[in-house]
Amino acid sequence: MSGLIAYCRQGFEPELAAELRDRAVLLGIASDIHAQRNHGFVLLRCDPLHVDTLLQQLHWRRLIFARQTLRLHAELKTLNSRDRIAPILAALPKTPCFGDLWIEYPDSDMGKPLAGLARSFGNALRPVLRSAGRLSAQLHPQWPRLHVCFLSGDHVLLGSTRSVDSAPWQLGIPRLKLLPEAPSRSALKLEEALITLLTPNEREAKLRPGMCATDLGAAPGGWTWVLICQHLRVTSIDNAALRPPLLNHPLVQHVRADGFRWIPPRPMDWMVCDMVEQPRRVAERMAVWLREGWCRHMIFNLKLPMKKRWDETRLCLERFETQAAVPLTLRAKQLYHDREEITVYASNDAR
């Protein structure tokens, strides 16, 4: 069996399946995609000769609806609860030796009850793999990592990935803690966006103390708070009030205005936007900000409709890129802390 495993948000399996199918077609690769709603993952099966190409081109950072992508090695069904280890050992590829082991389960209503089994099974499997020479005694991040994904007590997917090419969190979910002083839980969305959509080097270069930012539709202030934690000076645009600790903060200027109509008096380094509005309208307004040179970098959310979400995603991103009319770095992702939405990062490469 050859192909890919891709984790996603429960309920967005059809969107991920459509994204994978379209991307494979563009690459000229025939694929068989299996997705069931609310299962939290999608399987893509293909000719073994094409797996490496797909893993490279369908990297988790390049996919919008995938939290993690893995090389699929085997699917094991009807496992005996008295001995799950022997069939797993037998199904592993002859090479390589793995440098790490993650025992996982889908982030879904069916998968979450398997968390206890995953923890205990990892403790049992790890020493056996090491004794068999299939797992290094010490962590080796440069070696492939083995993923054992439980779909049920007797149903397992075996996959692998290179640590440097994969999401660095189990299940593809970053574990972020909401600090008590954060004005709202929406702060977690921007925090996750910064660590997911930007590389460490990009964060260091593009989020420097003293930079200027605008937060459109800022109230109650979750995204503004994240920016001032990065020591940026923020102009928060909203007719509604901001919550403490943003009131009278030296890095925050609150302007009571409509975020869709306000124009900055000078170019900004950053603009962020999490307004609840039709996604096409948001995409068009964001494009204006880049086209007019009002900012260099931006992060914004697109609230998706209940139906045809993949079609709407493609349309909005294509319209945004066309109307921005500047050279762009463009990345989009449905984050763990997103709901019926995606988060987009765009940067004007010409400035």
Swiss-Prot record:
Q: Which domain of life is it from?
A: Bacteria
One record GO biological process: methylation
GO CC terms of this entry: cytoplasm
> Where is this protein found?
Cytoplasm
InterPro entries from the entry?
RlmM_FDX, RlmM_THUMP-like, RNA_MeTrfase_FtsJ_dom, rRNA_MeTrfase_M, SAM-dependent_MTases_sf
Alphabetically ordered keywords of this record: Cytoplasm, Methyltransferase, rRNA processing, S-adenosyl-L-methionine, Transferase
Q: Which Pfam families match?
A: FtsJ, RlmM_FDX, RLMM_N
Q: Which EC class, in a word?
A: transferase
- PANTHER family recorded for this chain? RIBOSOMAL RNA LARGE SUBUNIT METHYLTRANSFERASE M, RIBOSOMAL RNA METHYLTRANSFERASE FTSJ DOMAIN-CONTAINING PROTEIN
Function as written in the Swiss-Prot or TrEMBL entry: Catalyzes the 2'-O-methylation at nucleotide C2498 in 23S rRNA.
The entry assigns this protein to a family as follows:
Belongs to the class I-like SAM-binding methyltransferase superfamily. RNA methyltransferase RlmE family. RlmM subfamily.
Name of the protein: Ribosomal RNA large subunit methyltransferase M
- Source organism of the structure: Xylella fastidiosa (strain Temecula1 / ATCC 700964)
